[in-house]
C-alpha cells in the first residue's frame, strides 16, 4: 500500500514559534509511518520557507526537527513549492500568521487539504474580542465581564471604564495571541497601565477581563458536521496563573484527566463547547477553555483552533482518555481535512 504524504509546517512568525516547534516534534513522533510519508518545512521569523527533513519511518530519539540554529539557508524555497498533489498539510503553527486564517488562506489558494479550521473561523477565534462579541450576540454561553481596548483610544477614559465595570484583579491579554503570551494580572491602576503597554507590544487590540477565582477546565473538540467532545480535563496550577513559562518552560502545572466535576456541569461544558465550535463555523478540531467557580458557575474563556500538540498538551491527552490514541487522532484529523477540502471544492460551482 502506498503511503500518504503529510506536510508538516512549523515555526512561524509569531511569538509562539517555539511552542510550534515543540508541538511539531511531538506530532512527528506520534505519526504512524506505516501509513504516512512526512515532509517538513520550517517557517522562519522573517517568513521564509525552508525545506527541512523527510521521514518515511519512525524517527530515532536523536532526530530533531531543524530550527533557526540548524536550517540550511540554501534549502529556502518559494512558499508555493510545498505543493504536492494528494498531500495533506498539517500546519502545526500557533498564533498570528499561523492560526488566524493567514496560512489557511494560502493553503486554499494552493488547493491543498489542511488540518484544522477554515479561514473565517480561524480569524474570528484567534481574536478574543471578536470571539466574545460573536458568542454574545448568537448564544447564551456565559462569559466573564470584559472591556475591549483598541490602540489609539484615550487611555485615561478606558482606565476609568475598566474601573467602573470591573473589579481588581483583572487580566490583560493581547486579543490576537495564545499560549498565554503577553498576558498580565493587574491588581491596581499602575499594574493595569503596565499590563496594557505589554499587551500592545503583541497586538493593537487588548482584552481586559474580570479576574475570577476559578478552576481552569478544558474540553477537546473533533469533527466537521458531526462534532464530538471529550470529557473535561483540569489544569492544576502551582503558580499564580497559567502563563507561558508555567506551560512550556518550568512545567509548573499538572493535569487531571478527566476532571472531577459534577456530571451535570460536565454535560453543560460539552454542550457549550460544541455550540461555540459550530457558532464560529469551526471544523476539524479545537479546544474550548472554561472557568468553573466554586459555586458551580461556568464561563467560556476561549476557543483555541490549533491547541498545543506537545506530549504534555491537554488536547491529545483528552482524546487519549476517550480511547483515541495520539497516532489515530492524527489519522482522524487528516481524514477530516480531506473531507472539508472536498466539500469546499464542491461549493465552487
Curated annotation (Swiss-Prot):
The entry's keywords: ATP-binding, Cell shape, Cell wall biogenesis/degradation, Cytoplasm, Ligase, Magnesium, Manganese, Metal-binding, Nucleotide-binding, Peptidoglycan synthesis
Name of the encoding gene: ddl
All residue ranges annotated as the ATP-grasp domain in the record: 133-335
Binding-site residues, Mg(2+) 2: 302, 304
GO cellular component terms attached to this protein's record: cytosol
Cofactor(s), names only, from the UniProt record: Mg(2+); Mn(2+)
SUPFAM superfamilies per record: Glutathione synthetase ATP-binding domain-like, PreATP-grasp domain
Uppermost EC category: ligase
Binding site for Mg(2+) 1: 289, 302
Catalytic activity: 2 D-alanine + ATP = D-alanyl-D-alanine + ADP + phosphate + H(+)
Record EC number: 6.3.2.4
Protein name: D-alanine--D-alanine ligase
Keyword rRNA-binding: no
Amino acid at each position: 500500500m502506498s503511503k500518504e504524504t503529510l506536510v508538516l509546517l512549523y515555526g512561524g512568525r509569531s511569538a509562539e514559534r517555539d511552542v510550534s516547534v515543540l508541538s511539531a516534534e511531538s506530532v512527528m513522533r506520534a505519526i504512524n509511518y506505516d501509513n504516512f510519508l512526512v515532509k517538513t518545512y520550517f517557517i522562519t521569523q522573517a517568513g521564509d520557507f525552508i525545506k527541512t527533513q523527510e521521514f518515511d519511518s519512525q524517527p530515532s530519539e536523536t532526530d530533531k526537527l531543524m530550527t533557526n540554529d540548524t536550517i540550511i539557508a540554501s534549502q529556502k524555497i518559494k512558499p508555493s513549492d510545498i505543493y504536492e498533489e494528494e498531500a495533506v498539510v498539517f500546519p502545526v503553527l500557533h498564533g498570528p500568521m499561523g492560526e488566524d486564517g493567514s496560512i489557511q488562506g494560502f493553503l486554499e489558494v494552493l488547493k491543498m487539504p489542511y488540518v484544522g479550521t477554515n479561514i473565517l473561523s480561524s480569524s474570528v477565534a484567534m481574536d478574543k474580542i471578536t470571539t466574545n462579541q460573536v458568542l454574545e450576540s448568537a448564544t447564551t454561553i456565559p462569559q466573564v465581564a470584559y472591556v475591549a481596548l483598541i490602540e489609539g483610544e484615550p487611555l485615561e477614559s478606558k482606565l476609568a471604564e475598566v474601573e467602573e465595570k470591573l473589579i481588581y484583579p483583572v487580566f490583560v491579554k493581547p486579543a490576537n495571541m495564545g499560549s498565554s503570551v503577553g498576558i498580565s494580572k493587574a491588581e491596581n491602576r499602575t499594574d493595569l497601565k503596565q499590563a496594557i503597554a505589554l499587551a500592545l507590544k503583541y497586538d493593537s487590540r487588548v482584552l481586559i477581563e474580570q479576574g475570577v477565582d476559578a478552576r481552569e477546565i478544558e474540553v477537546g473538540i473533533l469533527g466537521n458536521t458531526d462534532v464530538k467532545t471529550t470529557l473535561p480535563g483540569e489544569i492544576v496550577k502551582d503558580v499564580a496563573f497559567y502563563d507561558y513559562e508555567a506551560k512550556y518552560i518550568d512545567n509548573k502545572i499538572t493535569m487531571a484527566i478527566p476532571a472531577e466535576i459534577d456530571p451535570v456541569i460536565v454535560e453543560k461544558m460539552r454542550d457549550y463547547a460544541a455550540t461555540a465550535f459550530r457558532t464560529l463555523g469551526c471544523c476539524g478540531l479545537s479546544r474550548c477553555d472554561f472557568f468553573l467557580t466554586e459555586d458551580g458557575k461556568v464561563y467560556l474563556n476561549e476557543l483555541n483552533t490549533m491547541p498545543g500538540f506537545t506530549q504534555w498538551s491537554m488536547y491529545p491527552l483528552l482524546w487519549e482518555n476517550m480511547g483515541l490514541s495520539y497516532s489515530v487522532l492524527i489519522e482522524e484529523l487528516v481524514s477530516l481535512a480531506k473531507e472539508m477540502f472536498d466539500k469546499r471544492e464542491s461549493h465552487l460551482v
